[in-house]
Amino acid sequence: MKTENEMNSSGQKNPATGNGTRKPNFRHKNYRYKAQPKKEGTKNSTEKPAKNPNHRPQLRSQAKPVIKRPRKNTNGSKLKIIPLGGLEQIGMNITAFEYEDSIVVVDCGLSFPEDDMLGIDLVIPDVTYLKENISKVKGFVITHGHEDHIGALPYVLKEVNAPIYSTKLTLALISNKLKEHNLTKTTKLKEVKHGQVINLGDFAIEFIKTNHSIQDASALAIYSPVGIVVHTGDFKVDYTPVFGDAIDLQRFAEIGRKGVLAVMCDSTNAERPGFTMSERTVGHVFDNLFNEYKTARIIIATFASNVDRVQQIINTAYRFGRKVAVEGRSMVNVITTAAELGYLRIPDQTLIEIDQVKNYPDEKVVLITTGSQGESMAALS
């Protein structure tokens, strides 16, 4: 299946930066940041409130979701799992699940062309099968907001229009794409919370909290008349995430005890020994770098969608008294959306426009930019 950190370890390009896009205008209203005013009596917005040592948090999975069970398979019909992209390749993740007259599509991503595909900017999946069975398609269920999982939606929806179900941040990123293609009026977006179950035709689908290099990532428990399929989406096990809760391993265990027909699991870099470090560990690295280069301008390239990493850069810059400027169209779009939804907390007077950088000495500025993989059209390039 798909990648971790938007294809970072595979060496593939990052589709989030786009190709041939115009440099963003921070003076435009869509590219301005407005930090929320700090309430009286509260700590700085970048700091989490102190935990009560006597408080014992309740596990999420104690409140088990109510699942409307699909009807039993009494006629010998089979569940079809149809990969339309994303297997044995990086990117273009899309899988159809079909039972009788119901089809549910999980993810709808794009990929970059091979070296011999001259003149091609993006590659989208072949959805001929969905077009031929369009009356069966009940909806698109999206695991998270990376381009290789949502990037093809504006193109596929023009051929196969169905409601889209996902979590809050993922839907917001999808909505931004649909606006660019004038599809917002013709596409239904349905927000789903972790732990919630939706019913689509012969399927019931449960969203399970996971961690990834983008917030609001989900795994799916797909209940069908013939059994349960677990689709992990892209994930990592992070017990100390920067934002939100850790992966809900307890819920995976509960579903496993019920009996699972199949598991479709992210396997990117599974052949490598070791494990993926917590995102908080990267925050400690920033502290060391800012201490080491106190008199220099700091430029940090990262994936636009890695909101947790951007948050830690902003937190570190604030502690060291530096202003933060952002460059790169996708970076601006994601930061704006994440800040509006409350996934990114930005102190007042911290962000500046890119053309204001020249007004500050080097030791007072940090630049966050796209282009961490050397993409030809990214801001860093």
Map each language-model feature to its residues.
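Intrinsically disordered, low-complexity RNA-associated tracts
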Residues: 1-75
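Short, surface-exposed beta-edge/turn micro-motifs
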Residues: 363-365
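His/Asp/Glu-rich metal-coordinating catalytic cores
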Residues: 54-141, 146-360, 372-381
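Short beta-strand segments
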Residues: 368-369
